[in-house]
């Protein structure tokens, strides 16, 4: 559907400039969409690998906790993990990837106490299974934070891909065709007007020549 504009040469010039800009914008957005998709696929692959690793390690830790709960009384188990020996602070920054602000987690871990042990208990009344569970959880934290970062990045990039896709489609299937159709229409009208003008001038010339001929 063409735009509702006056079929003038000035309007034609404006529309041609708009078409050039729209075509250039479409190419840039399409390139951005392709690059976003390439990075998104890489992020999804990384996310799946991280998730598998995290789930596997969490499963191992939970199994050790179950084994520990089987050989320890609930009171001793609860007391053993009631006072964590580690404090964690997380600083959230942002990294710009193709106009997408992806979160970056910078976390600092500090063990309490002089010995710097990760275990919040003595070993007299605890089991080796509980030690293993605590050790696994301690080691899995960096992967958990990385997984949170990657999953959030995937979500944000998916949103940006969808927004870019809508803009690409709007240009490709609406704006550019409208401009092309309108330019074609105006050009046709201008050509018609030019032909009419030429025909009228030729007719006037013929009439003037005929008048001069009759006067001789």
UniProtKB/Swiss-Prot annotation:
GO biological process terms, semicolon-separated: proton motive force-driven plasma membrane ATP synthesis
In the record, what terms sit under GO molecular function? ATP binding; proton-transporting ATP synthase activity, rotational mechanism; proton-transporting ATPase activity, rotational mechanism
Q: Does the record bear Chloroplast in its keywords?
A: no
Span of the signal peptide: none
Q: Which UniProt keywords apply?
A: ATP synthesis, Hydrogen ion transport, Ion transport, Transport
**Which Pfam families does this one have?**
ATP-synt_D
Q: Which family does it belong to?
A: Belongs to the V-ATPase D subunit family.
Write out the function statement from the record: Produces ATP from ADP in the presence of a proton gradient across the membrane.
The protein, known as: V-type ATP synthase subunit D
Query: Species name for this entry?
Result: Clostridium botulinum (strain ATCC 19397 / Type A)
Show the taxonomic lineage: Bacteria, Bacillati, Bacillota, Clostridia, Eubacteriales
């Amino acid at each position: 559907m063409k735009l509702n504009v006056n079929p003038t040469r000035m309007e034609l010039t404006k529309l041609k400039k708009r078409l050039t800009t729209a075509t250039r914008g479409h190419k840039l957005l399409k390139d951005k969409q392709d690059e976003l998709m390439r990075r998104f696929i890489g992020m999804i692959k990384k996310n799946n690998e991280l998730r598998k690793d995290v789930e596997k390690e969490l499963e191992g830790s939970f199994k050790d906790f179950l084994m520990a709960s089987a050989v320890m009384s609930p009171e001793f188990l609860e007391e053993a993990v009631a006072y964590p020996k580690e404090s964690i602070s997380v600083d959230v920054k942002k990294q710009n990837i193709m106009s997408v602000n992806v979160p970056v987690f910078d976390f600092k871990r500090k063990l309490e106490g002089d010995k710097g042990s990760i275990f919040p208990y003595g070993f007299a009344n605890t089991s080796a299974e509980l030690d293993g569970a605590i050790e696994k959880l301690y080691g899995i934290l960096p992967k958990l934070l990385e997984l949170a970062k990657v999953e959030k990045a995937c979500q944000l990039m998916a949103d940006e891909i969808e927004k870019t896709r809508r803009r690409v489609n709007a240009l490709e299937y609406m704006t550019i065709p409208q401009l092309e159709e309108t330019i074609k229409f105006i050009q046709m009208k201008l050509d018609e007007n030019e032909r009419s003008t030429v025909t009228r001038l030729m007719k006037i010339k013929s009439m003037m020549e005929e008048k001069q001929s009759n006067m001789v």
